[in-house]
Amino acid sequence: MTDKFDANDETRTVYAVVYDNDQPVSTGQFLAETKIEARLTRIVTLADYCGCGYGAKVTEALETYTRREGFYQLTIHSELTAQTFYENLGYQTYGSKYLEDGEYCQSLVKTILKWEKNMDIAMLIAIVGGLLGCYLYLTKNNEPKD
C-alpha cells in the first residue's frame, strides 16, 4: 500500500485505514479542494480482502469526517471498475468518461449535508425570528384605540 501515497500526504491529507491485526488492508484519503468541496482519493483494498466491506467502511469514515468538518460535497475520480461500488454508496456520475494514468475513469459526486453542522445556528435564527414576529404582532394589537 505504500505506493498509494503522494506529495499531498504530509500537508493536507486525512486518512482512514482498516487494519487486520497490524496489517493495513484498506485505506482512503480525504483532500479539501475548497471550503465547501472535498475529494476522496486512493481508496484501495488489498485483493485478499476485497468483498469484505472494508472499502465501504473507509469511504463512510471519510464521509463522516467530511460532514463533521462542514464540507458540502465530495467528489471521487473513479476507475470504471469501481464506479458501481461508489454508486451503491450514493454517489452520482457527472461529466464524461476520461483517461487518467492509463485507466478509464468517471467522476462522481455526493452531497454531504453541511446543514447538520450549522443546524443550531439556523434553529436559533428561526426562534429569534419567530419571537420577534410574535412581539411585533402583540405590540401592534395591544396599542390603544382612539
UniProtKB/Swiss-Prot annotation:
Pfam families for the chain: Acetyltransf_10
Keywords: Acyltransferase, Transferase
Enzyme nomenclature, EC number: 2.3.1.-
Recorded GO MF terms: acyltransferase activity, transferring groups other than amino-acyl groups
Alphabetical list of SUPFAM superfamilies matching this protein: Acyl-CoA N-acyltransferases (Nat)
Domain named N-acetyltransferase: residues: 1-120
EC class: transferase
Taxonomic superkingdom: Bacteria
Key word Glycoprotein present: no
Keyword Transferase: yes
Family listed: Belongs to the acetyltransferase family.
Protein name: Uncharacterized acetyltransferase in arcA 3'region
Organism: Streptococcus pyogenes
